[in-house]
Structures are given as C-alpha cells and as structure tokens.
C-alpha cells in the first residue's frame, strides 16, 4: 500500500498546472462582514433582500472548501478540483489502507483510486451554517415572496450536509456524520422548504447509534 501513497504523491507533484487548494478566504469574509453590517442597519435590516444576501454569503463560505468534491470522484481528478495536497498519509479505515490527502480546509480519503469520504479541518467562517439558516429564515419572515430564493439556499445547505454525512459515514466518523444529517434536516425545517426529508433524521439517528 506504500506504493499507492507514493503513486498518488507523484501524480500530485507532477501536475504542473495544479496548485494548492485555492480559496479566497479574505474575500469571502469581507462579503460576509459587508452583509452583516447591512443587516445591522435599521433601514436595510428591515428588507428581506438584505438577509437573503447575508444568507447567501454564509452559504458561499460553507460550500467553498468542498464545492467540487463528491464520493466516487476519481482520485486523480483531485489535483484539478482541489489542487495539490499539502501531504499524503497512509491511514487505516475499517481495516483498509487508505490514502489521506491533506489540504488546508479538508482531508480527503482515497481508496482504490476513488474518493470514499472527507473530513473538514477548518471552516472558512466559524458557525456559518447556523448563521445562514437564521438569516435565511429572517428573509422569509420579512417577505414570503422570497420563498423560492430562500429555499434554494437552504437546500444547498441541506445537500452539503447530507453529502458530508455520507462522506463521514464512509470513513467511520459516525458522530460527525450524524450531526451533519441532523443539520440537513434542520435546514429543511424552514417554512420556505415545505416538508423536510425525514430520511435526514433517520440517518442522523442511525449514525448516532453506530
């Protein structure tokens, strides 16, 4: 299995067009700060659009580290979607040797040439999910006509969390997976989303008991 690790490292280092994971954290945080300031303004804070924009900026920061990542993605494709890993370790998951590719914001686990899961190391914005849900619910509260736009952002959160839940389950991080599915369900509990998908809650409970 050492050969697998060395092969993956060689592929990453030989890709001249590939770069380290690039996320413009400063720009994302500046956008959030701008929208937070607007939401605190008495006049602007009374408008649904202000809160929708705030929610969008949180969602953008949430999705940035893993936006092009998915379970089953070819490992060789990671250099294009995420850039070069900082390092590659050999780890054992469920008795199998797996390549753990370490990036600034996420560690991606590759087995048999495919991504089997990942674990986020550092968020772009701490607490962004809870803040996004609150901002989007506020937007809907102020103007229910914004419902479709609010739902789009909330479903982006739910889908992100569900994918994270699957990814964590595959690498034995059951507690993190359970929390991710619970958050996915919570995002869908907004009136803008209608009836939440009960399977999110089922998987949250299933992984909590694993």
Please report, for each region that a protein language model flagged, where it lies by residue:
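N-terminal, post-signal peptide beta-strand-biased segments of exported outer-membrane/organellar beta-barrel
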Residues: 21-31, 47, 74
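Residue-level signature for tetratricopeptide repeat
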Residues: 22, 50, 57, 167, ...
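Bacterial Sec-dependent N-terminal signal peptides
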Residues: 1-28
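Short coil/linker segments at helix-helix boundaries
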Residues: 45, 57-175, 188-198
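Conserved structural position within tetratricopeptide repeats
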Residues: 37-40, 141, 186
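Canonical tetratricopeptide repeat
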Residues: 53, 163, 197, 203-206
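N-terminal targeting signals for Sec/Tat export/insertion, comprising classic cleavable signal peptides
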Residues: 29-57
């Amino acid at each position: 299995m050492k050969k697998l690790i060395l092969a993956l490292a060689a592929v990453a280092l030989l890709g001249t067009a590939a770069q380290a994971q690039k996320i413009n954290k400063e720009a994302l945080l500046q956008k959030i700060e701008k929208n937070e300031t607007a939401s605190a303004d008495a006049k602007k804070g009374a408008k649904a659009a202000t809160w929708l924009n705030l929610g969008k900026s949180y969602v953008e920061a949430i999705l940035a580290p893993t936006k092009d990542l998915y379970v089953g993605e070819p490992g060789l494709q990671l250099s294009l979607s995420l850039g070069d890993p900082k390092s590659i370790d050999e780890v054992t998951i469920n008795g199998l040797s797996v390549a753990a590719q370490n990036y600034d914001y996420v560690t991606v686990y590759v087995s048999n040439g495919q991504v089997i899961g990942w674990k986020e190391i550092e968020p772009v914005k701490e607490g962004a999910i809870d803040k996004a849900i609150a901002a989007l619910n506020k937007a809907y509260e102020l103007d229910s006509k914004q419902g479709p736009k609010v739902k789009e952002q909330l479903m982006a959160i739910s889908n992100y969390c569900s994918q994270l839940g699957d990814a964590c389950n595959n690498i034995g991080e059951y507690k993190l997976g359970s929390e991710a599915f619970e958050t996915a369900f919570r995002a869908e509990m907004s009136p803008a989303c209608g009836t939440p998908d009960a399977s999110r809650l089922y998987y949250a409970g299933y992984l909590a008991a694993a």
